């Protein structure tokens, strides 16, 4: 026993002392010397043993996906298994994930001799004298004595150096020979960082993992895509480094004098964003902590506090609108300071008006609008007089509907069943309530959600008991009418539900109420079937218990009323919270906007346009085939011509003026059938597409899991107006290249956000003008795709990217 204790103690000391950085506690259990000695007899070191067993066709596909480069091999320090890391198969991590009695968590890179722990999700730092170092030294001797492996290792090592950032010096014994070539932090195929950049090209943005600060995957996925938005990075860099000043020269018709503006320091949110972008590019660490930026976002929008799961698209809007508001405030303050310096004194109201005029006449566009800002033109034409009117709206992203035929048919079928389940006296069968909630996502929800659902169930049960006890005083019809207009039901009908894409299940609480009530009744009254409960509801209202006196009933009713008032107050608070979660433009107080908002007053202006050209796009468009679900089909549906009829008819100003008696004072409005279409009139530099996967149907909220196909090169011309700005005359293409994807996997209640980003060289034209190419031969920029899940980064082939369940798509303009 004594020897065993000494042995355990020495092993633990060795494992802890050999780590230079944060100690890994899995070294002793993750290594096995005796097994590795036998495994070292195998001479096939340069290949994955699982890939060797694949069929020749699969191996050829794998080679094509990795551009002919041999994938890095990782050796398990427990059993000697050799698995690939760079390929789509990822046999090394699959070997670790296989259930065993002891963890196989430590792997050794046979290219750069670094050790990785899958449990710690970090590289294991070890000294040159510890037990782990001795084990690795023995393995290296075995590997490098094989001539085929030695040559392959040198070749692979040179290739890896050419695709890394300069950061850390490697631990290869040949570093004296290659000392002039500094390696970036870790091997490109490291299970954690996968730095995707060319060493000689500083313009390529590194890909770093981001720490999860507590259910912040929705935030990390968006930041990863923004970090690869090159034009945004350049503008942020200019704002942070340069002292911004500009002059405003009003129009000739204006009475205002030219004004020289000095801008103050950027806002805290903008600076935090700039700081994070620089850290991702320059840090030597494989994982970056975006705490400062997330803190600033929470200050602008407190709804993101509390470690709840949120919606990525909503976060993106708050982030961009917050920086946009800070820039507007900078310009506003600069104009005010310039007016004060000019020595002219104005009254408060007059000063506001002058500032507005300066902002409207000559103030430059802020960097958010320069990158993401676009414009939509909504065209309406009266069918009677053919008058064409137009209104232009600004946008930062486009929310596209995702059609789900299977869900629609299923919902229609349930609606028919729901109508048949209503009884003659107006009472609804409780089984239909259960059926109506089948479309809700699966999962029990968090403890907080379950507790809230139980409170709602208790409230309904108390309401029902109260109605039963008052049955002797109130008629059945009165009770039925009261229940049909119950405040809880009416509030459920008017609540605005946020489409939080992940497990923030508050939108579904209105439906969870019915499910929880059924479960509550089953637990308490198992002996009574649901059908009997529904059938006996009316009978319970008609009789007054003979064992109770009127005074007893009145006393109980008063007690119940107090409890109900308290529950109603809680319910009103819940309704208030749900209403504040609606997806509105963040100008409600969460974001400190200036006077300007993204959505100005929509006022249609009559234009002199040929009715035949009113609804013509920049390029011809073809209707999508049946059952097609792609970005193009979603855009087609979004920009389709609408017929305004019946209750949606247009109040035509021209027809109203042409009616008899109009000049005599008769100004009765005339409504006509009309046509309406929305087209893009000013395509943005960076096009952000939001696929609306979270939809509300009646009382249920569902996620559309249908795969939406998206192209690497998107031609936006069929969805742009004929008089589109920013397009050269005669051009019939507006091309965009995909570089970022935010994916949502899982259900409404239990989901996770990840990102796919394309690390690519920057284009000079993109930095200068916001566009990357000026010819019709534009093609997708060359680069490498990476899948990022918080701190974990893996290179992936394009085929894996195309199969992702996209929620947000980021395209950059290339023509």
Curated annotation (Swiss-Prot):
A GO CC term assigned to this protein in UniProt: nucleus
GO MF annotations in UniProt: cysteine-type deubiquitinase activity; cysteine-type endopeptidase activity; histone binding; histone H2A deubiquitinase activity; transcription coactivator activity; ubiquitin binding; zinc ion binding
Swiss-Prot/TrEMBL domain comment: The UBP-type zinc finger binds 3 zinc ions that form a pair of cross-braced ring fingers encapsulated within a third zinc finger in the primary structure. It recognizes the C-terminal tail of free ubiquitin.
Residues the record lists as binding Zn(2+) 1: 24, 26, 117, 120
Annotated spans, Disordered: 1-27, 148-200, 411-510
Family: Belongs to the peptidase C19 family. USP16 subfamily.
Job description of the protein: Specifically deubiquitinates 'Lys-120' of histone H2A (H2AK119Ub), a specific tag for epigenetic transcriptional repression, thereby acting as a coactivator. Deubiquitination of histone H2A is a prerequisite for subsequent phosphorylation at 'Ser-11' of histone H3 (H3S10ph), and is required for chromosome segregation when cells enter into mitosis. Regulates Hox gene expression via histone H2A deubiquitination. Prefers nucleosomal substrates. Does not deubiquitinate histone H2B.
Subunit relationships: Homotetramer.
Keyword flag Hydrolase: yes
Catalytic activity: Thiol-dependent hydrolysis of ester, thioester, amide, peptide and isopeptide bonds formed by the C-terminal Gly of ubiquitin (a 76-residue protein attached to proteins as an intracellular targeting signal)
Biased composition (Basic and acidic residues): 148-161
Active site: 217, 752
Residues binding Zn(2+) 2: 48, 51, 84, 91
Keyword annotations of the record: Activator, Cell cycle, Cell division, Chromatin regulator, Hydrolase, Metal-binding, Mitosis, Nucleus, Protease, Thiol protease, Transcription, Transcription regulation, Ubl conjugation pathway, Zinc, Zinc-finger
Predominant subcellular localization, coarse grouping: nucleus
Protein name: Ubiquitin carboxyl-terminal hydrolase 16
